[in-house]
Amino acid sequence: YHQAHAPQAYAVDFVGLNAAGVRASGVHPQELGSYAIFGARVVAPCSGEVVEVADGLPDLTPPQADTENPAGNHLVVACNGLLVLLAHLRKGSVAVETGEAVRVGQALGAVGNSGNTTEPHLHIHAVLEGTGSVLTGEAVPILFDGRHPVRNAVFAR
């Protein structure tokens, strides 16, 4: 899915699993609270400066999507020569402002269902700073727990 958009070549979409090992209670539920990840805390993946923030867009009922605001509520952190996008955040949850310094692990917001998404998840991707915006720049691979994520990889926290 992300391969069609070069800056998102290494993008990762995180979903949560409930106690039954599935993403949501029910089959394609419309209730956002049915999704295991909805409302989960989002933390800074790196220390740096917040360079972009958008908040106030509605959390949409699945499978509605906002194609005019693809990242929905989101923020961008500049760190270590990269721009890191954290997208589809919950309306009103963004806890930082543009220009604010953040530390790795600092709470930034909560997972929502805003933007061009069909169910709650956290989208993250990084581009090389100076090669364009977070939506047009040169994609950079991201490591999680020291490894490259692949489809259906499980990361426990």
Residue ranges and their predicted role:
Residues H2, D66-N69, A95-R103, H125-R157:
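Acidic, glycine-rich catalytic/binding loops that coordinate metals and/or anionic ligands
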Residues A20, G56-P58, L108-N116:
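Short, charged beta-turn/beta-strand-edge "cap" motif at the junction between a beta-strand
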Residues T117-V127:
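Histidine-centered divalent-metal-coordination microenvironment in nucleic-acid enzymes
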Residues Q8-Y10, F38, C46, A71-N73, ...:
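Residues that flank catalytic or metal-binding motifs in active/ligand-binding sites
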Residues R41-V53, A95-V111:
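Short, well-structured beta-strand-loop connectors
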Residues Y1-A65:
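Short, glycine/small-residue-enriched coil/turn segments at secondary-structure junctions
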Residues G16, E52, H88-K91, A110-N113, ...:
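A residue-level detector for short acidic-glycine micro-motifs
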Residues A36-I37, S47-R90, A95:
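Zn2+-dependent peptidoglycan hydrolase active-site motif and core
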